[in-house]
């Protein structure tokens, strides 16, 4: 059976902790989307870890940790995390990497930085991890899958073609140094050495595991409100954050995802720009930020202070509905123990109209009938 652990809100709901708990009884843990742009914080007997690409099940010797085809795989970051985990006494995790996973290229990170610089005050608050440029290339069909590392002639030919296009942008739009094909090729050959022992047909592996009755856990990143289709667009991430995408990003049949655990925390937080109805400011926000999370509410990837707010029932109801929740894990209620009363947002007042729906346009009769 497959269970998915996903977020109801903007991310940072505590999915890592819930995944870590459920991993104790799982055989396989799969990352199926996203990349190193968001982190899951785990605290256990080995210490405190902020995992950006490694699945949260790496601390259990009986599990296999899998990178699915839907992941934006930053190979150096992945193996840096792997080595850090092992250096702290964790037994070397069993890992597998999909041959269809696409790689975050060095220039994706550069383009992410350059575009944020170009946009200035109109930027999206990117973590500068290369995620948007990565997915742009993936859907423009000029990305690089892991399996392409093993055909060096075709790889170099494709790399030269892609660099020609990228260099036009670097020269005329960003006014930055051009890419060197030989240097990039040499770097990709280092990537090949790193991943070679772990590459497999993950979809086939997971389908065989299901036939054997194995317990599989899909670990999602961020939350519903960051989904590119159903989130608060355009302040979203570039890959689907919904449990439904687990079937695509892991390569399993949709009907096998029988449990969807949606994680929501007792207050709200967000990293980056965008609408945040229940947001609080000043000393009120600072106190909640200090008390929250594991050592405070700061981004696991960027270290930036998270924007803080009270629990948003409207957004959370929407998030759970879109995820198809079969179960809800409610986290960090203990953090709010310093309050006499816990503020909660139960509806939105939009120009005098009260609504309990997360709306992008004016409500129609059909919208209100279904609220």
What are these regions (language model features)?
Residues 78, 82-205, 216:
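Internal alpha/beta core interface subdomains
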Residues 21-26, 47-50, 111-119, 140-147, ...:
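A glycine- and small-aliphatic-rich helix-loop capping segment at beta-alpha/alpha-beta transitions
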Residues 360-367:
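Conserved small/polar residues in nucleotide/adenosyl-binding loops
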Residues 249-347, 355-359:
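A glycine- and small/hydrophobic-rich beta-loop-beta segment
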Residues 6-18, 125-140, 215-250, 268-271, ...:
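Conserved phosphate/anionic-ligand binding catalytic regions in large, soluble enzymes, centered on
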Residues 1-98, 102-105, 329:
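Basic, polar low-complexity surface loops/patches
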Residues 26, 30-34, 236-262:
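Catalytic or ion-translocation cores adjacent to nucleophile or general acid/base/metal-coordination motifs
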Residues 5-7, 29-33, 51, 95-99, ...:
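General beta-strand structural signal in soluble alpha/beta enzymes
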